[in-house]
Amino acid sequence: MRVLVQRVSSAAVRVDGRVVGAIRPDGQGLVAFVGVTHGDDLDKARRLAEKLWNLRVLADEKSASDMHAPILVISQFTLYADTAKGRRPSWNAAAPGAVAQPLIAAFAAALRQLGAHVEAGVFGAHMQVELVNDGPVTVMLEG
């Protein structure tokens, strides 16, 4: 499982022109792009959720837990792109939707259980993501 984390001052995700998740521009939050690969499981999803919740990448070296910062979770199978051969990426390392969807849902649920305010995109949908990366700060978590 990979989680590409960006510290943001605001973010929104739209599906069919409608906002389905957002971080308001009145503070800091995190956008978590989540990719799932073969062999990932619920334990890995929970561990990465806890790591993200306590990751000290916000202002003054604080975590989302410290600041009660919102987290926008967006599924992104392209985190497992293989570009080693040719000009077209291979997606073979990404888990199929039937495997990935429940693990991404479990990741978001684990964050909520820890106390996070979680917004989310729509799994499998074509989404438009807008964000203002603050810093910029971008970190890759892998489990």
Swiss-Prot record:
GO terms for biological process: D-amino acid catabolic process; tRNA metabolic process. GO terms for cellular component: cytoplasm. Keywords: Cytoplasm, Hydrolase, RNA-binding, tRNA-binding. It is found in: Cytoplasm. It catalyses: glycyl-tRNA(Ala) + H2O = tRNA(Ala) + glycine + H(+); a D-aminoacyl-tRNA + H2O = a tRNA + a D-alpha-amino acid + H(+). The keyword Hydrolase applies. A motif (Gly-cisPro motif, important for rejection of L-amino acids) lies at residues 135-136. GO terms for molecular function: D-tyrosyl-tRNA(Tyr) deacylase activity; Gly-tRNA(Ala) deacylase activity; Ser(Gly)-tRNA(Ala) hydrolase activity; tRNA binding. Pfam families: Tyr_Deacylase (PF02580). Its EC number is 3.1.1.96. Was identified as a high-confidence drug target. HAMAP family: Deacylase_Dtd. An aminoacyl-tRNA editing enzyme that deacylates mischarged D-aminoacyl-tRNAs. Also deacylates mischarged glycyl-tRNA(Ala), protecting cells against glycine mischarging by AlaRS. Acts via tRNA-based rather than protein-based catalysis; rejects L-amino acids rather than detecting D-amino acids in the active site. By recycling D-aminoacyl-tRNA to D-amino acids and free tRNA molecules, this enzyme counteracts the toxicity associated with the formation of D-aminoacyl-tRNA entities in vivo and helps enforce protein L-homochirality. NCBIfam families: D-aminoacyl-tRNA deacylase. A Gly-cisPro motif from one monomer fits into the active site of the other monomer to allow specific chiral rejection of L-amino acids. This is D-aminoacyl-tRNA deacylase. It comes from Mycobacterium tuberculosis (strain ATCC 25618 / H37Rv). The gene is dtd.
